[in-house]
Amino acid sequence: MVKLRLKRCGRKQRAIYRIVAIDVRSRREGRDLRKVGFYDPIKNQTYSNVPAILYFLEKGAQPTGTVHDISKKAEVFKELRINQTK
């Protein structure tokens, strides 16, 4: 099963997270299938590759709680509903 979750990057006390599609059996820093965005909690910046996120969601990937909240703010789920109604 594939999950969309955060992968920690950056240095000590300056964490930056990548949003990645990764197998659930892999550890947090394990090999990812694809990088689909990033989240910087210090500067409060996010970048999401919306087509890539939609691709993995349509294939059955489950986002973690934090990634779900980030995606909701980016209105990814509205685009998912629009694609499903077509």
UniProtKB/Swiss-Prot annotation:
Signal peptide (from-to): none
Keyword Ribosomal protein recorded: yes
Subcellular location: Plastid, Chloroplast
Superkingdom classification of source: Eukaryota
UniProt KW keywords: Chloroplast, Plastid, Ribonucleoprotein, Ribosomal protein
Organism: Liriodendron tulipifera
Gene Ontology molecular functions: structural constituent of ribosome
Keyword Chloroplast listed: yes
Broad class of the protein's primary localization: plastid
GO term, biological process aspect, one: mitochondrial translation
Name of the featured protein: Small ribosomal subunit protein bS16c
Sequence similarity: Belongs to the bacterial ribosomal protein bS16 family.
Gene Ontology, cellular component aspect: chloroplast; mitochondrion; small ribosomal subunit
Entries under InterPro entries matching the protein: Ribosomal_bS16 (IPR000307), Ribosomal_bS16_CS (IPR020592), Ribosomal_bS16_dom_sf (IPR023803)
